């Protein structure tokens, strides 16, 4: 952010027509639902009454030879949703990579007409809508199967039926429940089964634990449920230092071949993992290596579309490592193993 601010101050000094941090937003229809797209343009310049320039700044120690797809997509969307006034005939989009130590800049730019921006933006929305429609079809099928989802064992263990019933009541009513049960009483499946039964269309289950054994129990329970409901999807989140190929090899992320150009290859990898139903660490690594993408980032992207996410407590409760993409807690059910450890 500091580097970006330095560039913005310099540009404001050099060009009186330059302005920084312009907010943009546009309401769009996705699968019949209205969604609000929001963003902030790093730099904006009216070059003439007919031409404007939109700039996006990225800090990196590894200047790319070509513009990165995801970065260019961002500035392209800004160009498409930035309102045009008067007789604007073209928009110059500029993507600027800045070295944080030397401030050396690598620039990529292209000029588009309003019609070209509109057409490209429509294609982006169409691609996202296809993914969203596929997701909704799976959710609909999942919900149909869940209506008749039986407990995965022939009978409950002692007190397990009452445990599951109490969990279901709490989840449906939005109640916070602290449940104590002895080891070996089947807490994992006793919590996960009613949570799946209570799942609504846009909700997600987070099974949080501080222990490997707790994660293993949660994944085993989810697989038992998936055997009864093939539309359920589960993702296991592993700490970056244990998941990333480059982290384990001691490489800087900036130079990691699995991170560079990640979004150019991630969609097919995410689709493959979702088709498996259960994306545990070993499967994530296998698919990530096949598609040459970062396994940690792949697990996060897959979790965005999954029903059950198994991960460490810190991903929700530690402000330093909490995942920003999962901050809308109203849509999540939290099942916390060893909850007393939070105190």
Name each model-derived stretch.
Residues 191, 291-308, 313-343:
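Signature of the SF2 helicase/ATPase Hel1-core->accessory helical subdomain module
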